[in-house]
């Protein structure tokens, strides 16, 4: 379908599906015995295109740049039209080869789920893991800026009043959904950020008393049930479950219509970097659009960067639940020796002011 759409200019085309069944037994000295079975399905296609030999290469993926996975069977794959998706991304990849580069400067930004689930729901939330806040976990981009301000949990302003972030290990189809974690704690749903205020962390039986000691009071009453191990031969680590950025009340089309001239809309993620304390970041995307004279025009090689606290405090809102999307990341890495784990991430399009925007490779 990709070759039919743009011919030989779609010179590199890939696709794949993944299906897993995992059965997990857990027993502890308190008398708990659990037997859980998980079915995971996922698929992704991608294309690289160029105008001619030696020219600029642009790539697109479908449905998302970091995989498309859920706790479901083949019906999950059937729900998306991959043939139509292949034609769309082949056409977009070639269009990007002819498109202007992204603008440079401070602009309003709309960030779509294909990018924001990685930035807002994944890379940022690594900093909410209890072990990183204690300084006992530093692999793969370090600790957390919260480790320096732990006594301020419950009062510290993380973002604007529009920001609500939940850890939920019970949502249907989430790849981070289960009945019990690998310490035997039951699944839970709780806020990490409530109305912009930092109120929670991803905790465990191991980290909870240590965090309370650092906080200076008994803030956490029970484990957050976030401990998971890659296999029976690995030590459980504090892990993201399904991280859900709650939808707002804005109609997505109305959000786009009301955005000022020069606003940039960011699509699927393709690159990321974040500092040792999860504070300063830079993210690049496969595809972007700039609002010019009321129309959304294609832009390539777009990135945005900044300070996570200033960024989240500049949030103007989120689209409503009609635009909310749940993704499953199949390969979140953590630990030494490294372990891979599936984590779920949900968001609707997010709207921000005063975002630093630039060009990848410039």
PLM region spans:
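N-terminal small-residue-enriched
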Residues: 1-362
